[in-house]
Amino acid sequence: MIRDWDSLKAAVAGGAQLKYIFFWGHRAPKDGSVGKSCFSQWWPSPFEINGVGYATAEHYMMAEKARLFGDEAACAAILQAATPAEAKKLGAQVSGFVEEIWQLHRFGIVVAGNRARFEQNPLIREFLVNTGERVLVEASPVDRI
């Protein structure tokens, strides 16, 4: 099972024939159903971790970034952000930010947020489960993480 970048590289190097789901964007299909855009950090899927509510996984990631660097004011502002774009903008202004430290923690933060949101939102959980063994790939042309 592919769980991270290293296991994906090993599977490809070993000749595994993998299937991928490429996604980008966070808007629902026109019919209102859940589609692959639910994998976006910006998809509206409220969840809680340790009694704190998050509107999107982007809010969680940016709040954790602020916590990691001890910027409680930024964390509070991120939690109140009306949109994931606003949360991302506030996250870019976290004081005390050190790229090398962020690189060590960001993957685990993203995983924790996504585990919580998929566990707590049955419709997107079902969509995720139905992807089977396919590898999810965010195909954003503008954002690496």
Residue ranges and their predicted role:
Residues 1-145:
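Charged, low-complexity intrinsically disordered segments
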